[in-house]
């Protein structure tokens, strides 16, 4: 059972035991392959899958732009050069972390083998994966609690975040500040992650993820203006 105290303990354990920092040259190109190139590839996969589908213009009553609009607004040079290179999990979210209260030990499962071919990767990605898993509880999705409806050019999604998600987001943000990491990058990676996940899943989760990416992009850029 997740508690604020256990979440603090998890991040502290990850920082000392999991995320072993290491300097590498040319990490910007690796990040560009992982963030920019992969996103373009996944977007193309989605559009092949739904060649006749029109993206929603409103999501949950919020006006949103096209995915192309948001991808063009991203400062990819900043995103790919502002990195914290470390040994990372690659799919760092609650489903893949087991806690044993008897031994007070964490165990990670379902590791990703590489980050665009590199055995190390961008720590920001693990943090964004965790944030994305707080805002969208994958256990709830597997339990068939997800709801997606589209009508004309609008989409409606139900909230599938974890319980007390706002509090855990605040905790994660505080840990990022302690680690001197840029919270804006963590936030921006979340809709990129959702977008990249979208073509890999069946309906309606695929369109839910796509529309959720639009919604989070809209919130991010509206606050940035």
Model-derived segments and spans:
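A glycine-centered beta->alpha junction motif in the catalytic cores
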Residues: 1-7, 16, 48-53, 113-114, ...
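Conserved kinase catalytic-core helix
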Residues: 1-56, 67-73, 77-82, 88, ...
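Preference for well-ordered, secondary-structure-rich cores of eukaryotic proteins
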Residues: 5, 34, 38, 66, ...
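Alpha-helical elements of Rossmann-like donor-binding domains used by nucleotide-donor carbohydrate transfer enzymes
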Residues: 9, 13, 129, 171, ...
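Phosphate/pyrophosphate-binding loops and the adjoining catalytic core of nucleotide-dependent enzymes
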Residues: 14-30, 41, 45-47, 139-146, ...
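Regulatory N- and C-terminal appendages and interdomain linkers associated
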Residues: 61-65, 103-106, 181-225
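Active-site acidic catalytic loop and adjacent metal/ATP-binding pocket
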Residues: 69-122
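Active-site activation/catalytic loop segments of kinase-like enzymes and analogous catalytic loops
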Residues: 106, 114-175, 191-205
């Amino acid at each position: 059972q997740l508690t604020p105290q256990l979440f603090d303990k998890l991040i502290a354990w990850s920082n000392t035991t999991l995320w072993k920092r290491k300097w590498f040259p040319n990490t910007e190109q690796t990040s560009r392959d992982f963030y920019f190139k992969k996103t373009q590839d996944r977007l193309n996969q989605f559009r092949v899958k739904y060649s006749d589908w029109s993206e929603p213009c409103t999501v949950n009553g919020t006006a949103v732009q096209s995915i192309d609009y948001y991808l063009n607004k991203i400062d990819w040079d900043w995103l790919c050069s502002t990195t914290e290179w470390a040994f990372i999990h690659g799919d760092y979210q609650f489903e893949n972390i087991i806690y044993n209260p008897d031994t007070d030990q964490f165990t990670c499962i379902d590791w990703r083998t590489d980050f665009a071919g590199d055995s190390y990767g961008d720590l920001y990605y693990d943090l964004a994966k965790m944030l994305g898993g707080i805002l969208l509880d994958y256990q709830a999705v597997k339990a068939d609690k997800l709801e997606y409806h589209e009508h004309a050019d609008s989409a409606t999604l139900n909230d599938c975040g974890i319980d007390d998600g706002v509090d855990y987001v605040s905790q994660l943000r505080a840990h990022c500040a302690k680690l001197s990491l840029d919270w804006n990058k963590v936030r921006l990676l979340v809709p990129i992650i959702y977008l990249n996940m979208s073509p890999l899943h069946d309906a309606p989760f695929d369109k839910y993820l796509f529309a959720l990416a639009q919604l989070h992009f809209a919130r991010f850029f509206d606050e940035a203006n």
